């Protein structure tokens, strides 16, 4: 699949952005000394002419004593590829944070402190054998050690940990894999308690971070022990001023977050000693330094790191701070850094992966942007904007605990309840008897009491559901309820339309398989709402997928509608009962939750009534090539959602390859999430559960059934890449309908 927007963990895009900016910064900065001084002098004149940012900027000084970075060797023998942006954003980028585990991990530098007396003799013997190699545990500062490398050190020693070979060459590096070789040579293997001998982790002794008062990250620098020749962080900031000043200059000339180059109206520093050392340097830039250093980590109580919106070129993956990015002049969907990348993408082989083939189709998809952004909520304009700042939106509403942490890259601090991924869902928090506890924020309750009477009809929009449920249109709970409401919409609308012979609305029990369910299982309690919407139906949800926590395999628990109790019953899992317990007419109906942590084609169990998959991305996982034939053999109604119309087309192609069947025309999901998803290399609109389609199975031999519908006739394909042209004011662009909202 060409685009992975909506399927890739946001933290990976964030990591690629950090490494891309840091690599550029290190390459241009060079080593500390005369070269750095000259570089800063060149930037000073440029920065003095920059426009002023009215926001306060903050230079954070964050010491680190306890966390190290361990660089792995990758899945293949030999040095790993590192974590350069080419690997993070290449043709086959990792999609999940767990995919980084073979290459990088975080380790505690305090491990092994217990039981040191028992291992003291072994450690002394190892030191003698290694020629006195020192430990990589926490190092105390020494007065005669320098915090930063000197000008005599080569530039490649300032490369970030895990950087790619290309980045090393740009910073003055040499042979392939030199980074990993240097780590192996300079850090001797250590025997640590509970671990096998391995290369000692790198220690990021200090992190310099430039942000504005709103939390937008503008620049970052890492001081790493050993590999960069620095000492560990002590109580002072000796020789840190040149590094900090270079970081400030580069952050103004090339801000990492968003916006054009600019200088702050005022700067504050989070360290008293560094503040004094910068008093004579910062005024050179035409920037006012605060009279006193910042005494707390954040300049204001509402501070939160903002969503970063640095875009990338679809072909070479350069970020917007490295090159000016413009969309294709014909479809306006794909971003390129210049004509060379546009032409390369236009002429890709085979033809059906080239932009020449996709350009008219993407133009048609872009015309749906206005329709997808049409939602009844009071915050619609904000959350459907291309510049939507999700982290700030959630933080401003106090949505920083429970299931809301699954939507944000920010991890709550001590004292905040968090549903850890991989644990039995909600077990510890269900004991209070409130099934909606994990959906709450820091303020008033988001979910009102369950209405005393079941709905008289079926709902087909957020507006209707919110009205019946007593919810304000200012409530963002739709972001979490998109999953159960989508299941409800499939049961009450789509199955009766596409499979009327099943008479599904009259069934008193339904077995539903939720396939490739990872994120959905992490939010499992949101499916409680199905008991409110379908009170007379006994539901069984079987979550299946190899992305589920292995420890959850074969778990089974029951959510019950009546009584106020919450209990754990041995042998049958969890039994949860809500706080509103009037028994419904027609008898009690339960929601059974079962888990199978394996690919769907390996799952053994009773035939379901319905199969549902959320944001499936058939083309992104090889197991679908075996799971789709399994569904073909079962021939049960199978509905899937996708985050874009483009993804639906790709799923149809995968279905045709895997089974010879097809997919129904996708239709917008009225219960899609209102939050627009980030897209790094394109301008298309992506929303969780945006479109729905169902599988069209290949007719069985001799059945006489009609074959699966083929794909729609292709749009005419241009023969040459579109040339950027200027349109006169007032002239409309041909072939385009409603434009997406800004």
Swiss-Prot record:
GO cellular component: cytoplasm; male germ cell nucleus
Compositional bias (Polar residues): 151-161
ZnF bounds (MYND-type): 313-359
Bias-annotated ranges (Basic and acidic residues): 166-189
Subcellular location: Nucleus; Cytoplasm
Listed Pro residues bias regions: 708-724
GO annotation, biological process: negative regulation of DNA-templated transcription; spermatid development
Binding site for Zn(2+) 2: 328, 331, 355, 359
Positions that bind Zn(2+) 1: 313, 316, 337, 341
Compositional bias segments (type: Acidic residues): 110-127
Domain of life from the UniProt record: Eukaryota
Gene Ontology MF, one: histone deacetylase binding
Keyword tags: Cytoplasm, Differentiation, Metal-binding, Nucleus, Spermatogenesis, Transcription, Transcription regulation, Zinc, Zinc-finger
Biased composition (Basic residues): 725-742
Database matches in InterPro entries: Mss51-like_C, ZMY15, Znf_MYND
Annotated stretches, region: Disordered: 109-199, 565-590, 701-742
PANTHER family attached to this UniProt entry: ZINC FINGER MYND DOMAIN-CONTAINING PROTEIN 15
Connected disease: Spermatogenic failure 14: A disorder resulting in the absence (azoospermia) or reduction (oligozoospermia) of sperm in the semen, leading to male infertility.
General function of this protein: Acts as a transcriptional repressor through interaction with histone deacetylases (HDACs). May be important for spermiogenesis.
Subunit comment: Interacts with HDAC1, HDAC3, HDAC6 and, to a lesser extent, with HDAC7.
Protein name as annotated: Zinc finger MYND domain-containing protein 15
Gene name of this polypeptide: ZMYND15
């Amino acid at each position: 699949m060409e685009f992975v927007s909506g399927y890739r963990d946001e933290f990976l895009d964030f990591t690629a952005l950090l490494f891309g900016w840091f690599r550029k910064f290190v390459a241009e900065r060079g080593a500390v000394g005369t070269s750095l001084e000259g570089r800063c002098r060149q930037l000073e004149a440029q920065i003095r002419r920059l426009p002023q940012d009215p926001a306060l900027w903050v230079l954070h000084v964050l010491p680190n004593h306890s966390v190290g970075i361990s660089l792995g060797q990758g899945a293949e023998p030999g040095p790993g590829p590192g974590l350069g942006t080419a690997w993070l954003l290449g043709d086959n980028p990792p999609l999940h944070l767990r995919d980084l585990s073979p290459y990088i991990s975080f380790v505690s530098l305090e491990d092994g402190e217990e039981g040191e007396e028992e291992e003291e003799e072994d450690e002394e013997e190892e030191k003698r054998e290694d020629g006195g190699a020192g430990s990589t545990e926490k190092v105390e500062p020494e007065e005669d050690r320098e915090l930063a490398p000197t000008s005599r050190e080569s530039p490649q020693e300032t490369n970030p940990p895990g950087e790619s070979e290309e980045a090393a060459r740009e910073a003055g590096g040499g042979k392939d894999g030199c980074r990993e070789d240097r780590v192996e040579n300079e850090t001797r293997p250590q025997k640590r308690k509970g671990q096998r001998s391995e290369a000692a982790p790198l220690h990021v002794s200090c992190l310099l971070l430039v942000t504005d008062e709103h939390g937008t990250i503008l620049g970052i620098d890492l001081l790493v022990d050993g590999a960069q020749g620095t000492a560990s962080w002590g109580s002072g900031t000796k020789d840190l001023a040149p590094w900090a000043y270079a970081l400030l200059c580069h952050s103004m000339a090339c801000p990492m977050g968003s916006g054009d180059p600019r200088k702050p109206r005022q700067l504050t520093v989070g360290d008293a000693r560094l503040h004094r050392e910068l008093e004579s340097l910062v005024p050179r830039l035409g920037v006012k330094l605060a009279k006193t250093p910042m005494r707390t980590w954040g300049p204001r109580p509402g501070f939160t790191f903002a969503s970063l919106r640095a875009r990338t070129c679809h072909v070479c993956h350069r970020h917007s701070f490295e090159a000016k990015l413009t969309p294709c002049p014909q479809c306006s969907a794909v971003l390129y850094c210049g004509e060379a990348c546009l032409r390369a993408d236009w002429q890709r082989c085979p033809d059906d992966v080239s932009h020449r083939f996709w350009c008219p189709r993407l133009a048609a998809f872009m015309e749906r942007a206005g329709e997808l952004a049409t939602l009844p909520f009071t915050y619609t304009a904000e959350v459907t904007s291309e510049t939507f700042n999700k982290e700030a939106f959630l933080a401003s509403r106090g949505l920083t605990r429970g299931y809301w942490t699954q939507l944000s890259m920010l991890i709550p601090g001590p004292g905040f309840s968090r549903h850890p991924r991989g644990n039995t869902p909600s077990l510890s928090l269900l004991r209070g008897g409130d099934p909606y506890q994990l959906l709450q924020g820091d303020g008033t309750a988001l979910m009102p009491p369950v209405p005393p009477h079941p709905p008289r009809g079926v709902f087909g929009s957020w507006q209707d559901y919110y009205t019946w449920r007593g919810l304000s249109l200012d409530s963002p709970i739709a972001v979490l309820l998109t999953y159960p409401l989508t299941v409800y919409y499939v049961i009450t609308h789509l199955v009766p339309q596409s499979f009327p012979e099943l008479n599904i609305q009259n069934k008193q029990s339904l077995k539903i398989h939720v396939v490739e369910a990872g994120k959905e299982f992490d939010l499992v309690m949101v499916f409680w709402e199905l008991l409110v919407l379908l009170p007379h139906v006994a539901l069984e949800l079987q979550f299946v997928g190899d992305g589920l926590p292995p420890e959850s395999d074969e778990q089974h628990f029951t959510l019950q509608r009546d009584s106020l109790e919450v209990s754990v019953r041995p042998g049958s899992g969890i039994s949860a009962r809500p706080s509103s317990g009037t028994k419904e007419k027609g008898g009690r109906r339960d929601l059974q939750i079962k888990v199978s942590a394996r690919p769907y084609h390996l799952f053994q169990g009773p035939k379901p009534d319905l199969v549902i998959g959320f944001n499936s991305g058939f083309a992104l996982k090889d197991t679908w090539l075996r799971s789709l034939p399994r569904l073909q053999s079962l021939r049960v109604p199978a509905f899937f959602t996708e985050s874009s119309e483009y993804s639906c087309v790709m799923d149809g192609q995968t279905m045709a390859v895997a089974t010879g069947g097809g997919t129904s025309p996708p239709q917008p999901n009225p219960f899609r999430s209102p939050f627009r998803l980030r897209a790094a290399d394109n301008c298309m609109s992506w929303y969780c559960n945006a479109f729905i389609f169902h599988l069209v199975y290949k007719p069985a031999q001799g059945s006489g059934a009609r074959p699966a519908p083929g794909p729609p006739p292709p749009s005419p394909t241009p023969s040459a890449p579109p040339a950027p042209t200027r349109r006169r004011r007032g002239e409309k662009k041909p072939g385009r309908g409603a434009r997406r909202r800004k």
